[in-house]
Amino acid sequence: PTPCVIIHYPEETINLLPKAIGVKCEQVVCWVYNSNTGKQSRLISWWGCKPDFRKVRQPYKNLNDKRIQKRIAEGKTGAKIYDWWNINQVKNVSKEKTEHPCQIPEEVIGKIIKTTAEENQTIIDVFAGSGTTSKVAYDLGYDTISYEVDKKYCDIINKRIYERGK
């Protein structure tokens, strides 16, 4: 399979990367969240691959709509996800919170993996941080390789991977 690169920070890469390496951005999603700071969104970009939003379903919004009722009766589980994701940040009181200062929510990483990865692919995270990508990849049945230079964060990653099996 063709390598796929997904970048969620910083947003400037969407403008700089095509000029630097000659690859175009295939898809951009806006992840929005409530925050006490001025910044309340991040762009997530796909390079060298295009996500398939049909792989992930979201609940239907208007359950009284006859068309929606018909789809539900046919066994459909929801609409494909949009390119605008409203998902809360990981906060200090979040169940998934670790000691890492800028942790990405499991739901965001899960949507990225589910819409992009093919069966039997290995998920690689070269800035592993809190280990969310590896944890979610394992939870979804994928093998994963993580790289992190800070030993403190390596310990967090190892703990999360070990504890997920309990």
Predicted regions and their residues:
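Class I S-adenosyl-L-methionine-dependent methyltransferase module
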Residues: 162-166
